[in-house]
């Protein structure tokens, strides 16, 4: 059983995830992303090619489920795999904790151990008893404790609110948490790796880190948040030298080809005019605009007030994330600070980088941007569990009490967060979208800006389930983007056939705006209103 501890932890979380899985699309981007995966389209910036390709392949498996539910199931799979990798990484970290300790801390620990040893008086009878006791008993006890500690930390992460919520429906962050866990695993293995970073060997974990990093960036740009922590561990191990910088080159040789290969999906697929073709990234200008998320940069580092608001939200929501296990986290922060300063600094860097970056993004659904911070917190919880389980030395009864407290805290966390994340009865967005479409006449033109509740779900129901494909749904805000007209032209050419002259004038006036050049806002607004008016007359 011990051999499969990480797999079993992931499997247990998957079973619980099934109970909270959404049966259909839910709010925000769920409908659009489900449609993109099912139809092999182009998603909103930054495109998410890895997410799209893996989702499309999974959607082809004949499971006998509706596509929305099947793709939601994939989200649960990603989160479960993330839990399994996290749990295994936690065990590796505990087994190699001395390798992460600085020489100063190791010397201090050795002095304390020697001092305590000198104070203990051992009788002849005790010596005989000790000599007969198997030497492996203590090691086996520690090994078992490490397994249980790693599993406990894995469950704390798996059932934290935001992490758990990613398992309920289609979103890019379910795959991202899996990739974050793989990145941290490869970093831990790389730090304890005895070979050179430039080794061109299959087992070199630094090359695996580069591979997972490329996968991460091809899924979501928040992958960059792992880089400061990675740099800390790398240069801590190899120091700043000419050789250490040259050793990065083989990693780049792995990173860039994989990244480029995956992102080539966007222009290749866009040139085939998929039904969902956000940004139409067929040329270099549109491609760069899309993968950099230029249209969303207006909300990034927008103001100090916004950052202060998001920071306040992060800390006030922490208890809602972890509930009573937050006390284990606090104990873990103190424990690892003294036990292994290097692990503490690595986790602190990941935590602070994530929080300080994410609070500067002024959006409502900010929680998922804190996921790497929540993973870091769960590693702190690992050492909190380790500290509590160390009470074994104080007697079996005290140890059992500490274990029961840990288990009780995790059960409370699962119980409280279950109702917060449960989407198993969520049909609201399907019912609302279908009811609205049913209420319209054939070939109706519907103007809307309700992305979260109607437009995004309609992408799925119209393009995957073929429900009321005759209706022309226009996102009035996306009419301000040049690529959107190409998408309408492909799906409903008759809808804009009579206003092509106005569209041509608008696109000419829009070009300098999209390029960040000087533009005439009055002309743009006038043409935009003319297009909307002519669409419904």
Predicted regions mapped to residue ranges:
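Aromatic- and kink-enriched transmembrane "portal" helix at the membrane-lumen/periplasm boundary
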Residues: 18-20, 64-68, 72, 79, ...
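Transmembrane-helix motifs of polytopic, lipid-linked glycan transferases
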Residues: 7, 73-137, 182-189, 379-383
């Amino acid at each position: 059983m011990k051999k499969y501890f990480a797999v079993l932890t992931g499997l247990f979380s998957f079973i619980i995830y099934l109970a909270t899985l959404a049966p259909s699309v839910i709010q925000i981007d769920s409908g659009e992303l489900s449609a993109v995966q099912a139809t092999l389209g182009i998603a909103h910036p930054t495109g998410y090619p890895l997410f799209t390709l893996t989702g499309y392949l999974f959607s082809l498996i004949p499971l006998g489920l509706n596509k929305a539910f099947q793709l939601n199931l994939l989200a649960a799979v990603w989160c479960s795999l993330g839990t399994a990798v996290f749990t295994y990484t936690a065990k590796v970290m505990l087994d190699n904790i001395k390798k992460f300790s600085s020489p100063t801390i190791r010397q201090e620990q050795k002095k304390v151990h020697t001092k305590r040893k000198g104070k203990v008086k051992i009788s002849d009878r005790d010596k005989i008893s000790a000599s007969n006791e198997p030497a492996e008993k203590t090691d086996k006890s520690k090994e078992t404790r490490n397994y249980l500690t790693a599993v406990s930390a894995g469950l704390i992460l798996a059932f934290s609110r935001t992490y758990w919520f990613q398992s309920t429906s289609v979103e890019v962050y379910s795959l991202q948490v899996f990739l974050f866990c793989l990145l941290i695993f490869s970093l831990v293995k790389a730090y304890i790796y005895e070979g050179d970073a430039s080794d061109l060997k299959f087992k070199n974990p630094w090359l695996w880190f580069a591979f997972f990093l490329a996968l991460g960036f091809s899924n979501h740009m928040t992958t960059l948040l792992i880089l400061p922590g990675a740099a800390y561990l790398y240069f801590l191990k190899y120091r700043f030298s000419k050789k250490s910088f040259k050793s990065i080159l083989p990693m780049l040789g792995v990173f860039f080809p994989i990244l480029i290969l995956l992102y080539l999906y966007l222009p290749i697929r866009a040139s085939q005019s998929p039904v969902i073709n956000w940004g139409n990234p067929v040329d270099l200008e549109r491609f760069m605009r899309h993968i950099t998320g230029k249209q969303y940069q207006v909300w990034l580092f927008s103001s100090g007030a916004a950052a202060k608001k998001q920071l306040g939200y992060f800390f006030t929501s922490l208890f809602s994330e972890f509930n009573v296990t937050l006390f284990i986290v606090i104990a873990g922060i103190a424990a690892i600070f003294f036990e292994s300063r290097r692990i503490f600094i690595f986790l602190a860097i990941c935590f602070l980088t994530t929080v300080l970056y994410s609070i500067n993004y002024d959006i409502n659904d900010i929680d998922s941007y804190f996921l790497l911070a929540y993973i870091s917190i769960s590693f702190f919880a690992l050492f909190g569990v380790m500290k509590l389980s160390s009470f074994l030395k104080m007697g079996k009864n005290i140890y059992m009490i500490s274990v029961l407290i840990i288990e009780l805290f995790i059960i409370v966390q699962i119980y409280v967060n279950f109702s917060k994340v449960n989407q198993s009865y969520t049909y609201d967005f399907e019912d609302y979208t279908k009811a609205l479409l049913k209420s319209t006449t054939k070939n109706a033109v519907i103007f809307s800006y309700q992305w979260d509740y109607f437009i995004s779900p309609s992408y799925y129901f119209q393009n995957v389930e073929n429900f009321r494909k005759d209706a022309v749904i226009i996102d009035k805000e996306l009419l301000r983007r040049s690529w959107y007209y190409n998408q309408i032209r492909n799906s409903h050419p008759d809808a804009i056939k009579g206003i092509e002259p106005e569209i041509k004038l608008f696109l000419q006036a829009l070009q300098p705006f999209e390029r960040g050049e000087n533009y005439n806002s009055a002309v743009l607004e006038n043409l935009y209103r003319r297009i909307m008016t002519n669409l419904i007359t």
